[in-house]
Amino acid sequence: MLTVALPKGELLKNSIRLLQSVGLDFSAFLDSGNRQLQITDASGTAKGLLVRGQDVPVYVEYGQAQIGIIGYDVLREKQPQVAHLVDLQFGYCRMSVAVKASSPYKSPLDLPAHSRVASKYVNSAREFFQGLDLPVEIVPLYGSVELGPITGMSEAIVDIVSTGRTLKENGLVEITTLYESTARLIAHPLSYRLNTGNLHQLVEQLREGALTKV
């Protein structure tokens, strides 16, 4: 039986709609009263796992799920050993550097050397500033990263931005974009190579389904 890892949160609804378009129904995960973390499609051919977004590539890499749907931001940060198959064209957001709107910094290179940068995307932040040859201290934060500059703990943040509303409401402004992110279909490399459970056909159906929704 095929197992699909699905992310809790923003990507879940569109992920389920896409899977429904190819005949796999995990819509029970969207029910407000649902407490199940694992359900089987009515056809009996596939099982869905509902997990934290950060954990989707882990389940796929270790083979507990043959495929999964997750944002490119997570893949870029975690660098898991999975097969990257399809850009699903939904869940758009961007990884950005932001500072206080009242600050003098108009670009990352305006930041003083050894500034503090708060982020839950530690690897992405470090890679970016190393690429600029600008030494900074990355401060790991895993909630309300915007408070870093507000409280003075950091001069900047690196975080995911979708509409920019949260930044604006907290007096922050973007000064550059590291990369853009959308939902991606990933697979366990060996399962995909061996075409376990006719995986290639399903992937092509999902690819076509994603294209028709663009």
UniProtKB/Swiss-Prot annotation:
Keywords: Amino-acid biosynthesis, ATP-binding, Cytoplasm, Glycosyltransferase, Histidine biosynthesis, Nucleotide-binding, Transferase. InterPro entries: ATP_PRibTrfase_cat, ATP_PRibTrfase_CS, ATP_PRibTrfase_HisG, ATP_PRibTrfase_HisG_short. This is ATP phosphoribosyltransferase. It comes from Nostoc sp. (strain PCC 7120 / SAG 25.82 / UTEX 2576). It catalyses: 1-(5-phospho-beta-D-ribosyl)-ATP + diphosphate = 5-phospho-alpha-D-ribose 1-diphosphate + ATP. It is an enzyme of class 2 (transferase). GO terms for biological process: L-histidine biosynthetic process. It is found in: Cytoplasm. Pathway: Amino-acid biosynthesis; L-histidine biosynthesis; L-histidine from 5-phospho-alpha-D-ribose 1-diphosphate: step 1/9. Its EC number is 2.4.2.17. One of its GO terms (molecular function) is ATP phosphoribosyltransferase activity. Transmembrane segments: none annotated.
